[in-house]
Protein backbone atom coordinates (compact mmCIF):
# COMPACT_ATOMS: atom_id res chain seq x y z
CA UNK A 1 0.00 0.00 0.00
CA UNK A 2 1.35 3.39 -0.95
CA UNK A 3 2.05 6.29 1.35
CA UNK A 4 -0.75 8.34 -0.25
CA UNK A 5 -3.33 5.60 0.28
CA UNK A 6 -2.18 5.32 3.90
CA UNK A 7 -2.56 9.11 4.23
CA UNK A 8 -6.09 8.92 2.83
CA UNK A 9 -6.99 6.23 5.35
CA UNK A 10 -5.48 8.31 8.14
CA UNK A 11 -7.54 11.34 7.06
CA UNK A 12 -10.72 9.22 7.07
CA UNK A 13 -9.93 8.03 10.59
CA UNK A 14 -9.25 11.62 11.69
CA UNK A 15 -12.35 12.97 9.95
CA UNK A 16 -14.86 10.43 11.25
CA UNK A 17 -13.24 8.89 14.32
CA UNK A 18 -15.80 6.83 16.22
CA UNK A 19 -18.81 8.58 14.66
CA UNK A 20 -21.77 6.23 14.19
CA UNK A 21 -24.65 6.82 11.80
CA UNK A 22 -27.58 4.49 11.18
CA UNK A 23 -26.07 1.91 13.50
CA UNK A 24 -22.65 1.56 11.92
CA UNK A 25 -19.31 3.38 11.93
CA UNK A 26 -19.64 6.33 9.55
CA UNK A 27 -16.27 5.56 7.95
CA UNK A 28 -17.48 2.15 6.73
CA UNK A 29 -19.23 3.84 3.81
CA UNK A 30 -15.93 5.35 2.59
CA UNK A 31 -14.21 1.96 2.83
CA UNK A 32 -17.00 0.20 0.92
CA UNK A 33 -16.82 2.79 -1.86
CA UNK A 34 -13.03 2.37 -1.92
CA UNK A 35 -13.42 -1.41 -2.28
CA UNK A 36 -15.38 -0.89 -5.51
CA UNK A 37 -12.49 0.98 -7.15
CA UNK A 38 -9.76 -0.43 -9.39
CA UNK A 39 -6.83 1.97 -9.22
CA UNK A 40 -5.09 3.53 -6.25
CA UNK A 41 -6.06 7.00 -7.44
CA UNK A 42 -9.72 5.94 -7.51
CA UNK A 43 -9.38 4.34 -4.07
CA UNK A 44 -7.96 7.55 -2.60
CA UNK A 45 -10.76 9.68 -4.04
CA UNK A 46 -13.31 7.13 -2.83
CA UNK A 47 -11.95 7.30 0.70
CA UNK A 48 -11.92 11.09 0.70
CA UNK A 49 -15.15 11.72 -1.21
CA UNK A 50 -17.13 13.00 1.81
CA UNK A 51 -14.43 14.45 4.06
CA UNK A 52 -14.74 18.07 2.89
CA UNK A 53 -18.51 17.97 3.32
CA UNK A 54 -18.82 15.88 6.49
CA UNK A 55 -15.86 16.85 8.66
CA UNK A 56 -13.53 19.66 9.62
CA UNK A 57 -11.01 18.61 6.93
CA UNK A 58 -10.34 21.43 4.46
CA UNK A 59 -9.07 21.48 0.90
CA UNK A 60 -5.68 22.77 2.03
CA UNK A 61 -5.34 19.72 4.31
CA UNK A 62 -5.53 17.50 1.24
CA UNK A 63 -3.04 19.69 -0.58
CA UNK A 64 -0.67 19.60 2.41
CA UNK A 65 -0.96 15.80 2.50
CA UNK A 66 0.53 15.69 -1.00
CA UNK A 67 -2.40 14.39 -3.03
CA UNK A 68 -2.27 15.09 -6.76
CA UNK A 69 -4.21 17.93 -8.36
CA UNK A 70 -6.35 15.32 -10.14
CA UNK A 71 -7.31 13.65 -6.85
CA UNK A 72 -8.01 16.96 -5.14
CA UNK A 73 -10.10 18.17 -8.08
CA UNK A 74 -12.18 14.98 -7.97
CA UNK A 75 -12.75 15.28 -4.21
CA UNK A 76 -13.66 18.94 -4.64
CA UNK A 77 -16.06 18.09 -7.48
CA UNK A 78 -17.67 15.42 -5.29
CA UNK A 79 -18.30 18.01 -2.57
CA UNK A 80 -21.72 19.51 -3.26
CA UNK A 81 -22.04 23.17 -2.36
CA UNK A 82 -25.17 24.27 -0.54
CA UNK A 83 -26.11 26.74 -3.27
CA UNK A 84 -26.01 24.09 -6.00
CA UNK A 85 -29.13 22.13 -6.91
CA UNK A 86 -28.56 18.40 -6.53
CA UNK A 87 -29.12 17.34 -10.14
CA UNK A 88 -27.04 20.27 -11.43
CA UNK A 89 -24.26 18.92 -9.21
CA UNK A 90 -24.75 15.44 -10.71
CA UNK A 91 -24.63 16.83 -14.25
CA UNK A 92 -21.43 18.73 -13.41
CA UNK A 93 -19.83 15.51 -12.14
CA UNK A 94 -20.11 14.00 -15.61
CA UNK A 95 -17.30 16.34 -16.67
CA UNK A 96 -14.86 14.55 -14.33
CA UNK A 97 -14.55 10.80 -15.10
CA UNK A 98 -12.74 10.07 -11.83
CA UNK A 99 -15.41 11.80 -9.75
CA UNK A 100 -18.13 10.13 -11.83
CA UNK A 101 -16.79 6.64 -11.14
CA UNK A 102 -16.57 7.29 -7.40
CA UNK A 103 -20.04 8.85 -7.28
CA UNK A 104 -21.54 5.84 -9.05
CA UNK A 105 -19.99 3.53 -6.45
CA UNK A 106 -21.20 5.81 -3.65
CA UNK A 107 -24.74 5.86 -5.00
CA UNK A 108 -24.77 2.08 -5.32
CA UNK A 109 -23.60 1.79 -1.72
CA UNK A 110 -26.30 4.25 -0.65
CA UNK A 111 -28.90 2.12 -2.43
CA UNK A 112 -27.75 -1.14 -0.85
CA UNK A 113 -30.88 -2.68 0.67
CA UNK A 114 -29.20 -3.61 3.95
CA UNK A 115 -27.93 -0.07 4.41
CA UNK A 116 -31.20 1.55 3.33
CA UNK A 117 -33.11 -0.51 5.90
CA UNK A 118 -30.93 0.98 8.66
CA UNK A 119 -31.39 4.56 7.52
CA UNK A 120 -33.67 6.74 9.58
CA UNK A 121 -34.73 9.22 6.88
CA UNK A 122 -36.91 9.06 3.76
CA UNK A 123 -35.40 6.00 2.12
CA UNK A 124 -37.78 5.89 -0.82
CA UNK A 125 -36.96 9.45 -1.76
CA UNK A 126 -33.27 8.64 -1.38
CA UNK A 127 -33.59 5.54 -3.57
CA UNK A 128 -35.40 7.50 -6.28
CA UNK A 129 -32.81 10.27 -6.20
CA UNK A 130 -29.96 7.76 -6.26
CA UNK A 131 -31.46 5.87 -9.19
CA UNK A 132 -32.00 9.05 -11.21
CA UNK A 133 -28.43 10.13 -10.42
CA UNK A 134 -27.07 6.73 -11.48
CA UNK A 135 -28.92 6.97 -14.77
CA UNK A 136 -27.33 10.36 -15.47
CA UNK A 137 -23.81 9.33 -14.46
CA UNK A 138 -23.82 5.92 -16.12
CA UNK A 139 -25.03 7.57 -19.30
CA UNK A 140 -21.92 9.77 -19.19
CA UNK A 141 -19.44 6.89 -18.95
Regions found by a protein language model. Give the residues of each.
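Active-site helical microenvironments for divalent-metal-assisted chemistry
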Residues: 1-141
Amino acid sequence: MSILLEKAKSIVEQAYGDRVENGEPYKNHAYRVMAAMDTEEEQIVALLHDVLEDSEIKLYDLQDAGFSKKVIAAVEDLTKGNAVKYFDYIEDLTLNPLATKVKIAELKDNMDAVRVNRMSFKTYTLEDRCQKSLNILEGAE
